[in-house]
Each structure stands twice: as C-alpha cells, then as structure tokens.
Amino acid sequence: LGKLVPHGLKNASRDPATLEAWWRSCPRGGVGILPGPEVLVLDFDDPEAWEGLRQEHPALEAAPRQRTPKGGRHVFLRLPEGVRLSASVRAIPGVDLRGMGRAYVVAAPTRLKDGRTYTWEAPLTPPEELPPVPQALLLKLLPPPPPPRPSWGAVGTASPKRLQALLQAYAAQV
C-alpha cells in the first residue's frame, strides 16, 4: 500500500470507504495498524526474547499477538492511564516498543514478496479489552527516575560572609 500512502502515517485512514477502495486498487497490499496512546505493542525481533519474557511474565500468553515473518512476535497490551513510554527505550534486548499513538505495526494478513506472512496467534481485541502490561514488566520499561536535585538551604540560611566567600571562590575559577 506504499503507493497509496506515500507519506505513511500522514496518509493513514480509518474511513471504511477509503480502505475498501485501497483494497480494490491493491488487493495484495500490506496492513499497518497505528495503535492509540493507551496501547503498547512489544515487538520481539528475536524469538528467544519472546520465549524468555513469556516465561518471566506468563500473562503475556493471554495477550493478542501475531507472529512475524521472521519468527518474532507483536504482543498488544494496555498501558495504565497516564503512563507514557518512549519508543527509544531499549530496556529489554531484542524487544522494541511500538504503538502508543506514535509507531505503527505491520499486521496480518500482510504477505511479503517472498511469500512469508504475518499471522495472528491470538486475535486482536479493542484497546479497552487488552490485558494490562504486567506491573513487573512495566517497571523495566519506565525511564529511570531523574537524579536527585541538590537541596539548597532556604533563603536566608547562609550568612552573608559565607555567600561572599562562595562567590569569590567561583569568581576565582572563572
């Protein structure tokens, strides 16, 4: 469908008539899904990463997921309200973060030129029916807290002589 959406997500549509026209025009086109901001898609490029995380978080097995042509997985989960993750987070080797209203996912029944396909292993559900991201997994994906800020004393707690000495010391370094 690249020729139908030359600007990618900017040309995306949810309009049934538009989608129907695209399918008539290009019946072998691929499918892309842009999940909303409340949907996290774990993109496992490495089948071993999927197996490891699935064993660590058995709840992932109940999530809607598809198998990719290279043997990876796309696992669809619901983020807690107000939680924002960065797609650039690389907290888990072999796993990319997609969806979240910012990154699309190629989806079944897309077929590659070599004949390999995307296939659903567990069917996709509406966002409100997706299982939540397991808490322990979410903690791995959240950015680290900012470093503590230095706590300065309240105004008026340093003597004028101390402030003058600090200013002179800083001025001498400049």
What does each of the following model-derived ranges do?
Residues 169-172:
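A mid-sequence, solvent-exposed acidic-amphipathic segment
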